[in-house]
Amino acid sequence: MEALVVDAGSKFLKAGAAIPDQSPAMIIPSQMKRMVDDGSSSADNPTTVFEDVTLDPIERGLIRDWDAMEDLLRYVVYTGLGWEEGNEGNILFTDPLCTPKAIREQLVQLMFETFNVSGFYASEQAVLSLYAVGRISGCTVDIGHGKIDIAPVLEGAVQHIASKRFELGGTELTKLFAQELGKTNPSMNLSMSDVEKLKEQYANCAEDEIAYKKTQNCEIEQHTLPDGQVISIGRERYSVGEALFQPSILGLEEHGIVEQLVRIISTVSSENHRQLLENTVLCGGTTSMTGFESRFQKEANLCSSAIRPTLVKPPEYMPENLGMYSAWVGGAILAKVVFPQNQHVTKADYDETGPSVVHRKCF
């Protein structure tokens, strides 16, 4: 039985058997709805009324609701991927940057005590995203739904002192898009779900800052929503991508994403600058935005540093849109090594040491 690989993000959970040259078998929303008794039933009125409660098990990349996470994983491994209770196999999880030790321990405890897995392994997303493009050293720029992580990696080890997380991601870009659309379409009543879909369809990156300024006169497109409302979309589509290069658009006093990358790498020993900068990997759903990659490389070419960031192209045999699930693909590659070579946490390891064994065997 192939090991399972799970990459649980704030917006989507990616899971499937460890087959590296295929996309994950399951890509499902992480957000869940649970039916809850509203407490209105009584002896006089025995009719029970249920209401939908929306749950987000994962916030900004980290597990926050363990009961919901257990339900989500139960659905994934048993219903979605065909595990049978009493015959569970090995499982590998991707770890976001800055995952607290307590969360790692609680996850390994959940896997062995509730899911009764045969073996467990976890590895950091930055390392796995590099594995997906055939590298063990480089720097990942991961723009997720709830965060941006920039992490230098040397010989398969994340340089945590130099790494940086920004509490900014696709969620904030969606809110920005909603605000911008509201200015030009004041009578519209848009749900965040509508805005998210519009962002995915229309968001674009201008070629450079000068081109962005010229978008004030860009062509206006009309889009008809499912409810019949017609919305006008003009320059707003460019503000989403521009905010990553000019965070002041979001009201933040931060450097743009390329400048952040260069500054982060400059804190690592100078002898490693070249291999980090020349092996830059973009990952996360937002990086698939039209024009983002070319804008990133153009900004990189304008850097004042002696060595400029260069983006790594994924191998041709890898699945399309690799950046959207590169950590999962890297996890599938690693699973082919750690489980056959018995480098993982076994049930015997767990029984002997307890949850803290994860820090000794998974790094």
From Swiss-Prot:
UniProt tissue specificity: Mostly expressed in flowers, and, to a lower extent, in roots, seedlings, leaves and siliques (at protein level).
Work out whether the entry's keyword set contains Heme: no
Where does the record place it?
Nucleus; Cytoplasm
Q: What is its main location?
A: nucleus
Molecular function terms, GO-annotated: structural constituent of cytoskeleton
* Modified residues annotated as N-acetylmethionine in this record: M1
Disulfide bonds listed in the record: none
Q: Cellular component per GO?
A: cytosol; nucleus
Q: Single Gene Ontology BP term?
A: chromatin organization
Alphabetical list of CDD domains matching this protein = ASKHA_NBD_AtARP7-like (cd10209)
What InterPro entries does the record tag this protein with?
Answer: Actin, ATPase_NBD
Q: What keyword terms does UniProt attach to this protein? A: Acetylation, Chromatin regulator, Cytoplasm, Developmental protein, Nucleus
Q: What induces it?
A: Before cytokinesis.
Q: Known PANTHER family for this protein?
A: ACTIN (PTHR11937)
Q: What does this protein do?
A: Essential protein required during embryogenesis and all plant development stages, probably through a chromatin-mediated regulation of gene expression.
Q: Which family does it belong to?
A: Belongs to the actin family. Plant ARP7 subfamily.
| Protein name in the entry | Actin-related protein 7
Which species does this protein come from?
A: Arabidopsis thaliana
